[in-house]
Amino acid sequence: MEPEIRFAGFPAPWEQRKLGDVATIVGGGTPSTNNDAYWDGDIDWYSPAELGEQVYADRSARRITQAGYDSCSATLLPAGKTILFTSRAGIGNTAILRRSACTNQGFQSLVVNDDTDVYFVYSMTDRIKNFAEQKASGSTFLEISGKGLAAGEFAFPSKDEQTAIGSMFKQLDHLITLHQRKYDGCANPLFLERRISCRKPSHQNRCSATTTPSG
């Protein structure tokens, strides 16, 4: 399903694609906390509690050493192409990685392919979160697996149209951040209303329908 309103110059239909076809889903790992040689290194290592409302992840609270990294199942995630995605204990908190880093087991992060715009996918994360929460399972706490997340199907336009939409949301997020700083957390209501209405799960596959100019 494609949006009713689109940027001019993009006539091609949107296509349903599995998330696993546009991104590699990567889990994490934790070195032994009993070995001091594994900690206080220079490799960023994230836990779910560190993700909140920020768009970007710049620096983790804890870091591990190369020995710690080698000792566990953590994977180094590339900067600029990775969306951290919490998979339990609060499913669907996200941030775009600005520095190469790894995570603990509480993530199923999305490393987008070269033909996919990272900010476009980031603009979809509320819908991805909604899917993940519906598919999550577990007796102790709900969790979505990498395989389960990869199976989610969403509508995608061409890379150029993704970039146009992603750029629009990037500008909106930047303006929201500026207003938050200026007014001590109070963002411009117009931008907040547009962003929230666009990213609500009930507007699935229509991320540009309420905000994208046609000219």
Show the residue positions of the predicted features.
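Extracellular/lumenal glycan-associated surfaces
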Residues: 3, 21, 163-175, 179
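Short, recurring structural edge motifs at helix starts
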Residues: 4-9, 140-141, 150-159, 174-177, ...
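Non-catalytic DNA-recognition/assembly elements of restriction-modification systems
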Residues: 6-29, 206-215
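Proline-centric
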Residues: 8-13, 109-116, 148-161, 166, ...
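DNA target-recognition domains and sequence-specific DNA-contacting regions of bacterial/archaeal
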Residues: 20-156
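Hydrophobic topology marker
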Residues: 186-189
